[in-house]
């Protein structure tokens, strides 16, 4: 998968059909597949209410991928298609795992005027191929316009095994709904790791049941620096944290899209959110304050403090139960 520009939509009319016009998408998507060949002169694969997305019976991951694709088709074209385990018929999109594809995240896509075959080296490969199909769809909800995929083939696999994106919620909290939108965008671009920066000097954002003050106190800062040169603050409290159930919800949401969540808890530095909540964990005993500006701060968890070492173990035990 390489990064490159996306092609333009193409439209042509079919006088004998109703709707009166067919809009064809483009297999040249972002990230750019390794190999793409399409024939825009050939009669395309036309999506209609009789289109079926076929997946192997008993394969829950491919069932979920089929359901994703059906929802994406509905979103892009307004057309409702069905998912099924029945034998493939004409006008089907057929999902399958092919062990001969050596790269587990790779896939092969073949589009004819009658059917689409999508084979992946594993379920994740099928998922990435499905995302290519999604991006290849024309955006049309006009009942007078049919949506179609051009005849062609795609052979694709990732250049990098680790494709990550980091979100820092320690300095600025984002709600669960927004994180899900980010994960959807990551899935769309074949990203497979979500790096979740959960704690910072400026705020502790994950519930730790053994240490409730981390979120009762450590998640709140009274104001935030908005102009470094003039040292202007917004005078608005900033807060927010994720319960363990919400964190598990994010982990599952990402996993359903073949994205692994990597939690980050900084220590022994970047720990003012914890020291404000539990001053006895520091080297001086405090008092400590949540920083309202950015930078490096000298106070850290005290490595020679047995309570600090136990704190680190307790926190990581709860984090590992979530992730």
Predicted feature descriptions by range:
Residues 9, 13-15, 50, 114, ...:
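Compositionally biased, intrinsically disordered low-complexity segments
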Residues 102-299, 303-311, 315-323:
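Feature activates predominantly on carbohydrate-active enzymes
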């Amino acid at each position: 998968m390489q990064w490159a520009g996306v092609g333009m939509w193409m439209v042509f009319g079919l006088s004998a059909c109703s709707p009166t016009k067919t809009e064809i998408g483009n297999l040249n998507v972002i990230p750019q597949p390794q190999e793409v060949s399409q024939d825009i002169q050939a009669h395309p694969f036309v999506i209609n209410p009789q289109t079926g997305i076929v997946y192997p019976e008993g394969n829950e991951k491919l069932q979920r991928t089929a359901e994703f694709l059906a929802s994406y088709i509905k979103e892009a074209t307004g057309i409702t298609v069905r998912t099924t385990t029945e034998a493939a018929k004409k006008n089907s999109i057929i999902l399958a795992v092919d062990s001969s594809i050596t790269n587990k995240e790779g896939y092969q896509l073949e589009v004819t005027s009658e059917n689409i075959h999508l084979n992946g080296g594993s379920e994740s490969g099928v998922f990435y191929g499905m995302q290519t199909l999604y991006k290849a769809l024309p955006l049309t909800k006009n009942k007078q316009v049919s949506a179609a995929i051009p005849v062609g083939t795609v052979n694709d696999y990732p250049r990098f095994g680790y494709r990550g994106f980091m979100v820092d919620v320690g300095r600025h909290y984002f709600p669960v709904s927004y994180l899900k939108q980010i994960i959807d965008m990551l899935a769309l671009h074949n990203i497979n790791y979500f790096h979740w920066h959960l704690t910072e000097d400026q705020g502790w954002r994950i519930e730790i049941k053994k240490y409730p003050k981390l979120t009762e106190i450590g998640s709140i800062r009274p104001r935030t620096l908005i102009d470094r040169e003039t040292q202007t603050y917004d005078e608005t409290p900033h807060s927010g944290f994720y319960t363990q159930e919400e964190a598990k919800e994010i982990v599952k949401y990402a996993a359903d899209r073949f994205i692994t969540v990597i939690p980050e808890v900084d220590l022994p530095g970047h720990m003012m959110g914890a020291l404000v909540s539990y001053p006895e964990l520091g080297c001086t005993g405090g008092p400590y304050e949540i920083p309202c500006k950015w930078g490096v701060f000298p106070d850290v968890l005290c490595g020679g403090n047995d309570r600090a070492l136990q704190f680190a173990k307790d926190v990581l035990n709860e984090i590992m139960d979530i992730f």
